[in-house]
Amino acid sequence: MPKLKTKSSAKKRFKITASGKVVAAQSTKRHGMTKRSKRSLRTRRGTALMSAADTRIVAPFMPYGL
């Protein structure tokens, strides 16, 4: 059976932890941030664990768990 390819878009956006959880950057930080509160912007720094439902969608894109 041939090797499976990893989706390039997924490997740029997501990381899989050793326990199999998917980590991604926080959303809502591209533009229009002057309307948002400082607290809202602070909480969107860094990364966050994705929900189980989203993990099931993303995991097949990275068969070898980059």
Curated annotation (Swiss-Prot):
Region (Disordered): 19-45
Keyword Transmembrane annotated: no
Compositionally biased region (Basic residues): 28-45
InterPro entries, alphabetized: Ribosomal_bL35 (IPR001706), Ribosomal_bL35-like (IPR021137), Ribosomal_bL35_CS (IPR018265), Ribosomal_bL35_sf (IPR037229)
Keyword Ribosomal protein listed: yes
Single GO MF annotation: structural constituent of ribosome
Keyword annotations: Ribonucleoprotein, Ribosomal protein
Any one GO BP annotation for this protein: translation
Cellular component, GO, one term: ribonucleoprotein complex
Alphabetized HAMAP family for the sequence: Ribosomal_bL35
Family the UniProt entry places it in: Belongs to the bacterial ribosomal protein bL35 family.
Name of the protein in question: Large ribosomal subunit protein bL35
Organism encoding this protein: Anaplasma phagocytophilum (strain HZ)
